[in-house]
């Protein structure tokens, strides 16, 4: 356990940020799973609508530093390819 006041504060801040990052990652994974389920079900309209929300979530996570920007770009590219192959 930390003895120094600033170290105690850093522990609190780290816990708060970890929870927030975990929440953002979890929501991102959920939207991606919904998108992939729509692709599997061959539901073109729903997949297109979900794709925009996935891209928005990925961009937000990359902007906030939760995921790396290259990872977000790679995911967007691969998911767009899945969407285009379905059409």
From Swiss-Prot:
GO MF terms held by the record: small ribosomal subunit rRNA binding; structural constituent of ribosome
Leader peptide range in chain numbering: none
Gene3D superfamilies in the record: Ribosomal protein S20
Keywords: Ribonucleoprotein, Ribosomal protein, RNA-binding, rRNA-binding
Single biological process term from Gene Ontology: translation
GO cellular component: cytosol; small ribosomal subunit
Database matches in SUPFAM superfamilies: Ribosomal protein S20 (SSF46992)
Coiled coil stretches, renumbered: none
InterPro entries: Ribosomal_bS20, Ribosomal_bS20_sf
Family per similarity comment: Belongs to the bacterial ribosomal protein bS20 family.
Task performed by this protein: Binds directly to 16S ribosomal RNA.
Protein's recorded name: Small ribosomal subunit protein bS20
Name of the gene encoding the protein in the UniProt record: rpsT
